[in-house]
Amino acid sequence: MSKESSPPKVPSTTMEYERRLEAAAEIILEKEAKFSNTPPDCSEFGVTATLKPHQVEGVSWLIQKYLLGVNVVLELDQMGLGKTLQAISFLSYLKFRQGLPGPFLVLCPLSVTDGWVSEINRFTPNLEVLRYVGDKYCRLDMRKSMYDHVKKSSKGHFLPFDVLLTTYDIALVDQDFLSQIPWQYAIIDEAQRLKNPNSVLYNVLLEQFLIPRRLLITGTPIQNNLTELWALMHFCMPLVFGTLDQFLSAFKETGDGLSGLDVSNDKETYKSLKFILGAFMLRRTKSLLIESGNLVLPPLTELTVMVPLVSLQKKIYTSILRKELPGLLELSSGGSNHTSLQNIVIQLRKACSHPYLFPGIEPEPFEEGEHLVQASGKLLVLDQLLKRLHDSGHRVLLFSQMTSTLDILQDFMELRRYSYERLDGSVRAEERFAAIKNFSAKTERGLDSEVDGSNAFVFMISTRAGGVGLNLVAADTVIFYEQDWNPQVDKQALQRAHRIGQISHVLSINLVTEHSVEEVILRRAERKLQLSHNVVGDNMEEKEEDGGDLRSLVFGLQRFDPEEIHNEESDNLKMVEISSLAEKVVAIRQNVEPDKEERRFEINSSDTLLGNTSSASLDSELDEASYLSWVEKLKEAARSSKDEKIIELGNRKNLSEERNLRIEAARKKAEEKKLATWGAHGYQSLSVEEPILPDDVDSSSDAGSVNFVFGDCTNPSTVSHEPAIIFSCVDDSGNWGRGGMFDALSKLSNTVPTAYHRASEFKDLHLGDLHLIKIDDNDDQQNTQASKPLWVAVAVTQSYNSRRKVPRSSISIPDLESCLAKASFSASQKSASLHMPRIGYQDGSDRSQWYTVERLLRKYSSIFTVKIFVYYYRRSP
């Protein structure tokens, strides 16, 4: 054998580490084999539910591992297999069979805390559970209650609960308290949160918390690489699995795909790792359970629909690349900046989703209309899909990665008058649970929202906030408008509908923009899923080389002719083709035999649907030379476009200089007279001048934000710890109102109504005026942080005429925009955040006005890079 063909030598320390793991696995499996095969009767330790065979087997496995002193991972194939019931049945065993007094700790996402409490109360009613969530004051009250209980109770039962249920974030915030409790068992639900061994959460739980016995529940032990697998196994058994370097040295080839080892050695490595994992991990896949007859689920059909970009999207897509041209040229010559590259990818993905994700793209005035749908190829296809799904009586889970995309989709739902629920990271736990209950309430007579508004047609969910733990089997269709970076997250999200309790054929539709960065992400997702299957599944398949970051960005660009990008007819989508596509996609649920093959469709000018079961391939022909050729074309097109804009702007400058001078002279004279009167009476205006909008606004910038919160906007200290401006609308009557914001601002400081009255007295109260009133520390009765500057911005946006039938007018949108611009500019100058009630609902305005207001908020938060908080007022029960 030649030197080149000889397999590399494996270091002895690596062999020793691997053999040690194999020996530990052998000991565990041998002892486990000696246990009785008689399944436990869960009713004997207080479980009221009838468990399915695979659930009984899971509880039995947990019991055996506990008795052997082994901490384990329970992987339930993207969930949906009753993991909560198995976990609480096991806790009931510990409490009532083993006699452990507790306490037991359960960590899980906020969105599923209600589900855990509900199942504990229903199926293990003898277990006392405490849901330790809420704001810091609520949790402080719970801690005081625990302390009082401990003082009064005997040593036999010193805590008022058996199970404490809380979230990962609260575990970190309240670690000083929670880490002092000697937990007799801990369950980490959705344990993929522990995939990063360098994270604060990982190390705090491992080093600070008293949790010697642990169970990790996950549907995705491997999401990106073997480091994540080691992190979970090391968290369970730190002494057994040693260091990360040892683990990677022993099993690195299983994650590399092309390892340099011969095939036989490669297979042996897979075999060894799978054997070791078998002692510490129980993997329950739906496919195996269905094949064995232990689980019956309705069919699942998965489709990928390749959607083209419309003309506006192409313009934005290429303009992003044009803007990033210097960085891309640096990449093509070998340089790279990972952070910069990621930012470009994010902007390209936004262009694929919807152009209105970029400030300044939506045409003004901001009004609901078909322009919202026509601006995005994805939304055009989604529109046709939802129309047919609604008419057919189906219900839909609509997943998006970005919450800003959900904002646009929500506007679309309002435009089409579809009933919907929404769940994202900003929704409080109580509202989440209510939304899930509302959506899950089925009716027997279809989904006509006008007949029964309690049953939403669509449940819109941000993948990261609601993609795990929820039970939404009321839906039989799942649509992914955007794909998560991690394919396992989308797989988990799909299980919200395709799980135990589902009785309908489930259709999953993945919308992917063809010939774009999204298609590259799709391909890489397939490779990540293959890695997971290789290590903990049954097959092994060599993976291909990575396409490279530059090729990912410029994938498909050779199909974009820069000279035709501005020609809308060159890529005009025919509604007949889209309609035909939607018809076939929706009908496929009835027309095809269920199988595991993922089908892929694309819109095509000659053939509306093209089935393509092969993976999306990276463009091997796109080398540096062809890319640079495209760049030169793009530069030429950019220069041509710029010249046209200069000519167009030049033609618009046709103003009368003489007229402007006359107006300016009259204004100056009136201003001097007014200031003289004010000076004589000691009045100083608090009105803010018109801001000068910056010329270099980056329309693709993510700076600034609009946040929706619950609470009182006149007490912003609970949300923000920075200087704050409270924004409130008034009329021009000079009469300070009563109730609502008027009373709240008067209570905050008498300075506010006084300043308003003074402005009216000196005729300084006009529509579009914004008066910025400083709240002195002595006057501020609510602000608990005396050192934090606070202002009130009184926006004059309504006229008042006593002779009108309704004296006070509705809010004037142009005047509101002027006030918002001034307030945002002032906030930017003072490094402050902006706080306001939900404008547009106060005076009974319709939904379309709020659509306009929300767009204006996003516009000026982006221009002046300020944070705006919109408050939903929670009324007392």
UniProtKB/Swiss-Prot annotation:
Disulfide bonds: none annotated. It comes from the Eukaryota. Its EC number is 3.6.4.-. Keywords: ATP-binding, Chromatin regulator, DNA-binding, Helicase, Hydrolase, Nucleotide-binding, Nucleus, Transcription, Transcription regulation. GO terms for cellular component: nucleus. Residues 381-548 form the Helicase C-terminal domain. GO terms for biological process: chromatin remodeling; DNA repair. Belongs to the SNF2/RAD54 helicase family. PANTHER family: CHROMODOMAIN-HELICASE-DNA-BINDING PROTEIN 1-LIKE. This is Probable helicase CHR10. It comes from Arabidopsis thaliana. The gene is CHR10.
